[in-house]
Structure formats: structure tokens, C-alpha cells
């Protein structure tokens, strides 16, 4: 059952609406409070071009995976939003707000710390060692808080127990973003990969960092060839 105040936009317990922060093709994101805590509400949009039953099943499946990923990471103290509430019927999810700036803005403003990209690589490896791939790892979905801690956000395309290809693809998505949007930082992806390898530990059933970076190189070369 939906808690009162979720969809109304009227301040009310447990969700108190403040402002809309993003209107995208996939979802509408609003800022507010959940039981007095700073929170973000993501409401997934139906796809008009899709069969309604199929769209509903796909949306529920994606939301279930996103919720599972966030819950898993939360239990393991991974730097990502905390999961507050999920409503599969209304296609919405409420998570904690991460204060700070997207890596995109930090890099655009020229305020990137010397070891930041290496630490980003370490966070990505830590994500993978927790059995999760991100699926949309751009500099908009990497946050740096006021203390300099790095967080990953927006797990709408995440996978649980991902295959090697998914892990390599995470690095490739970030590589494409760095190349297209941050060309003023040459060699950025190499710093990320260095941090990815440096953080690596041996985890059962998780491909080691060498295999992942090798697959990333294969994907990158494949894209260059096709391009």
C-alpha cells in the first residue's frame, strides 16, 4: 500500500516533497524528505511505444534489481544511497540524498584532486567485488561529497552477479564519457584502471581485475574497429 503523501507533492508524512530536480525520458526525480531525512524519489515513466504488459514487467524487473543492488551495497557499507522505500505498483523508489557534486561538474570546474580518478577506479572495483555491475557509469553518476568521499548513484541499469562482459562494459562506458566530455584530462581512464587494479582483492566467483581490464581493452578495441 502506498504511504500517504508520496504522489501528491504536498508535505506529509512519511514523504515530504520539496522540488523536482530532473525530468528525463526514463524517470522523474524529486527531492524531499522521508521520515525527516533528506531523500530523493525516482518515479519511472511508462514507455508509450511498448506493449503495456511488457513495459510493466520490464519496469518491475528493473526496479527489483535496483532495490536488491542498493540493499546489498547498503548492508556492506558501500558508498551509495541507502534504500528507504520501493513501490512496484506505482514504479517508484525512495533513496537517501547524497550531498556533493557529480564528478562531471568537479572535472568541468577544474577542481579534480590528484588521486580522485584512481580512487574512482578503486570504488568501481569494490562495487564489482560486491557482485554488482552499474550499467550506466558516467561522470554524472559518480558523486564527490564535501569531505572528498566518492559515491556511486543511479543503479537503474545495475546487474546482480554480473558476467565478465558487464564488468568490462562498466569501464568502457566511463571511458567513453571521459573521452567525450572531459578531453582536457588526457589519460583519465588509465588512472581509473590503475586504481581498479590497485584495489583488487581475491573474491570467490568474481572475475579478477586482470580479466576485467583485459575484457575492457577488448571492448574498447571492438568499439574502435566498428566505429
Range-by-range predicted roles:
Residues 1-19, 219-226:
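Juxta-kinase regulatory segment immediately upstream of eukaryotic protein kinase catalytic domains
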Residues 59-63, 74, 78-120:
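Conserved structural core of kinase catalytic domains
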Residues 151-227:
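C-lobe/activation-segment region of protein kinase-like
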Residues 73, 123-127:
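Conserved hydrophobic alpha-helix
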Residues 17-64:
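ATP-binding glycine-rich loop module of kinase domains
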Residues 129-139:
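Catalytic-loop of the protein kinase fold
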Residues 141-152:
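Conserved protein kinase catalytic/activation segment
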